[in-house]
Amino acid sequence: SGSGLEQIRAAGISVDGPVLEQEAKALNPGFVKSMTVGLPFVRCKLAMSLDGRTAMASGESKWITGPEARDQVQQLRAGSGAIITGIETVLADDPGLDARSELVCEQPLRVIIDSRLRISNDAKILNLPGDVIIATAVSSKELLADKQKMIGNENVTLYSCANADGQVNLEQLLRMLVSEKQCHD
């Protein structure tokens, strides 16, 4: 509850502190942020070439980072509660969004932002072990039930959370990840 020091002092015990408060908070930024504001600590992974592009002019996607950067991404994935991507990445690359590291004890939750439920029922991400959440703006219970049945995987959850513009409500999604899935980062 954050009142431990005051309780000890109230009991008449002399306490020096807080000590190294910022250093302690830096050890677990996800937990601290989720406990203070109800949102996870979000890391964004981007890569671009020196000319500011993320793909070749033809639209073909190539690795533009070196092995060290790719290893660092895997370490970040291994330490994350969830990995989030958009439907365009899923449609273009058919990723698994898994953490490929010896540090992985349990795969992170995979989350796809797909406002209109365009994901293919045979997308790789839907057929790997582990839980997947598809965040959508679709609110029709009938459409959601039909899509869930077509996907046919009990580890996949459709989560409806539309904003006023008919897109996925990112804040609502992030708050749900903290409150229901204990994803702090």
Regions found by a protein language model. Give the residues of each.
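Zn2+-dependent cytidine deaminase-like catalytic core
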Residues: 1-23, 109, 138, 142
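Active-site ligand-binding patch in enzyme domains
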Residues: 33-34, 43-50, 54-181
